[in-house]
A protein has these predicted regions:
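Conserved SAM-binding loop of SAM-dependent methyltransferases across substrates and taxa
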Residues: 134-146
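Class I S-adenosyl-L-methionine
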Residues: 235-272
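Conserved alpha-helix/loop element of class I SAM-dependent methyltransferases that forms part
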Residues: 107-125
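Conserved class I S-adenosyl-L-methionine
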Residues: 123-134
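S-adenosyl-L-methionine
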Residues: 152-191
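N-terminal auxiliary segments of SAM/dcSAM-dependent transferases
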Residues: 1-88
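Conserved beta-strand signature within the Rossmann-like core of class I S-adenosyl-L-methionine
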Residues: 226-234
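A short glycine-rich, Lys/Arg-flanked "PGG" loop and its adjoining helix->strand segment in the class I
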Residues: 211-225
């Protein structure tokens, strides 16, 4: 993170300190990763020797970042509105056209990723992370001592969100992050070169190719025998959507060479 991140909760805390005449206060400017000391002045607040203005308008469900000249929402519009969204848990989620891409109601999106990564037992493994998103899968793979994580992310806008999110791990020797389409990128991986995989694609209506038998066959090709794959499917309503996506996913994975069992809001598949 290169500057402070401000949410409505943080901004209200700053304003309350100003009203109370408090010279200094403790708050978080990195979405709950840490706390820091801020001086609340009458016209501006000061952090690490730099003065920042109070926002004229600070909206809920919005994160503001410092551009070097002013605060702007962590959001972009390029065909769709994509934005980083604060949660009560600390680690943010993100939305595309108002649709949440990560769970937040019952559990932190970061903690949710930990549970799913545990299913593939990453320790010592080369892990394929097909749809990197904010990098929470990758973060827990690294925490779980994966030997290496190979991550793809197709959206430049998501990568931009990720660059501003203090909960997203930066690329390094253990984390390869490719800006590209994994449908094409997976073809560059040798047979049996991956020990485990995590597949968290956008919903079927947006990225049907990531649910195809052809792609699952590629996953089977790059995974070693007995390699584990967690495939997030969510729990779409078959009555309203007209299709049972989890059942379709399980059927195609079996056809591609996996043994499959339901696991929470996805399926756990083992390469035969």
């Amino acid at each position: 993170m290169t500057g402070p991140l401000v949410t409505l909760e943080v901004h209200d805390t700053l304003l309350a300190a100003r009203r109370a005449g408090e010279a200094a206060l403790e708050c978080s400017l990195d979405l709950g990763r840490s706390t820091t000391t801020v001086e609340a002045g009458e016209d501006a607040w000061t952090w690490q020797g730099q003065r920042y203005p109070y926002l004229e308008t600070c909206k809920g469900r919005t994160i503001y970042y410092w551009t070097g000249a002013q605060f702007e929402p962590v959001a972009r519009f390029s065909g769709s509105l994509i934005k980083l969204v604060p949660t009560g848990w600390g680690p943010p989620t993100f939305e595309i056209d108002g649709i949440k891409m990560l769970p937040t109601s019952q559990v932190s999106p970061y903690e949710d990723a930990r549970h799913k990564v545990a299913l593939i037992q990453p320790r010592g493994k080369v892990v394929l992370d097909t749809c990197g998103g904010l990098g929470y899968f990758a973060a827990w793979c690294l925490e779980g001592r994966a030997a290496r994580v190979l991550s793809w992310e197709k959206s430049a806008d998501v990568l931009w969100l990720r660059s501003l999110n203090p909960w997203s791990p930066p690329p390094d020797e253990a984390l390869s992050l490719v800006h590209g389409d994994v449908v094409e990128g997976i073809g560059t991986l040798p047979d049996g070169s991956v020990d485990a995989a995590l597949h968290d694609p956008p919903r079927f209506g947006i990225a049907g190719e990531l649910y195809s038998l052809t792609f699952y066959q590629e996953l089977a090709r790059v995974l070693r025998r007995k390699g584990r794959l967690f495939h997030y499917t969510g729990s779409p309503n078959a009555l309203t959507s007209g299709r049972d996506v989890p059942r379709e996913v399980a059927r195609r994975l079996r056809e591609a060479g996996f043994d499959v069992e339901p696991s929470g809001d996805g399926v756990l598949a083992i390469r035969r």
